[in-house]
């Protein structure tokens, strides 16, 4: 994409990071939370510039809630805190990967990760001949 | 969110899956590609209903390219194919996690993953006192 929406809200995010961040039309980028030691993908949230800034500077994962329209510090309500271990942007700066140490369940359903319950395909059983794999 | 945009394009996706898929305003959902055995997060792409259908049924990861406005079978140009091992939706059906076996580099830059080059924070060095972690 040749242009990117500007931040929707005021932010203290480092100007150089903000300059290369490529936001969706709603001013957000998807943020993948991954357990730092096991590699499990825990959940995907959304960050605006300020949520990324807070994630980088407070040691706690902070997201922008699209449904509630407010910042959301993971674990503030549930106790299921995500302590930030590392943060990276992807090659075109439109996705964040946060490696975290997750306290308790990552999912609001109580499941360990948000991807445990709704498995569409397992064990590569898509009918593709083994010779093609 | 109480409603979700409908598919933008015709699709053969299973009707029950399509009924619970919660798409962004552009009709897409983010899709995380993770190496199935090492747990590395390789990249994030975008899928519409038909890209998800093809990913579920062909054994190859298929995305919707937002910049080119077309389907994109990972590896068709580069040879860096992603063979599908499993596919899951998250708890609110607005994100896809695809575990894959990645051939070669996942990133178009030649890097192993798309998250290798632009690290914003390492080793939890956010200045949070150790006692709080």
Curated annotation (Swiss-Prot), chains A, B:
Cofactor: Mg(2+); Zn(2+)
Domain of life: Bacteria
Molecular function terms, GO-annotated: magnesium ion binding; phosphoribosyl-AMP cyclohydrolase activity; zinc ion binding
GTP-binding is among the record's keywords: no
SUPFAM superfamilies in UniProt: HisI-like (SSF141734)
Location, primary (coarse class): cytoplasm
Keywords: Amino-acid biosynthesis, Cytoplasm, Histidine biosynthesis, Hydrolase, Magnesium, Metal-binding, Zinc
Pfam families on file: PRA-CH (PF01502)
One of the protein's GO biological processes: L-histidine biosynthetic process
InterPro entries membership: PRA-CH (IPR026660), PRib_AMP_CycHydrolase_dom (IPR002496), PRib_AMP_CycHydrolase_sf (IPR038019)
EC numbers for this chain: 3.5.4.19
GO CC annotations, alphabetized: cytoplasm
Residues that coordinate or bind Zn(2+): 91, 107, 114
Enzyme class: hydrolase
Disulfide bonds: none
Pathway(s) per entry: Amino-acid biosynthesis; L-histidine biosynthesis; L-histidine from 5-phospho-alpha-D-ribose 1-diphosphate: step 3/9
Catalytic function, reaction form: 1-(5-phospho-beta-D-ribosyl)-5'-AMP + H2O = 1-(5-phospho-beta-D-ribosyl)-5-[(5-phospho-beta-D-ribosylamino)methylideneamino]imidazole-4-carboxamide
Cofactor: record remark: Binds 1 Mg(2+) ion per subunit. Binds 1 zinc ion per subunit.
Subcellular location: Cytoplasm
Binding-site residues, Mg(2+): 90, 92, 94
Assembly and oligomerization: Homodimer.
Membership in a protein family: Belongs to the PRA-CH family.
Role played: Catalyzes the hydrolysis of the adenine ring of phosphoribosyl-AMP.
UniProt-recorded name of the protein: Phosphoribosyl-AMP cyclohydrolase
Gene it is expressed from: hisI
């Amino acid at each position: 994409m040749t242009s990117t929406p500007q931040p929707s809200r005021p932010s203290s995010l480092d100007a150089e990071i903000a300059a290369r961040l490529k936001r969706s039309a709603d001013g957000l980028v998807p943020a993948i939370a991954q357990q730092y030691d096991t590699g499990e993908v825990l959940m995907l949230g959304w960050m605006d510039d300020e949520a990324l800034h807070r994630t980088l500077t407070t040691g706690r994962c902070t997201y922008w809630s699209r449904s509630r329209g407010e910042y959301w510090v993971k674990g503030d309500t549930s106790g299921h805190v995500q302590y930030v271990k590392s943060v990276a942007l992807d090659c075109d700066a439109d996705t964040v990967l946060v490696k975290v140490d997750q306290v308790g369940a990552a999912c609001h359903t109580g499941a360990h990760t948000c991807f445990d319950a709704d498995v569409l395909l397992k064990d590569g059983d898509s009918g593709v001949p083994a010779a093609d794999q």
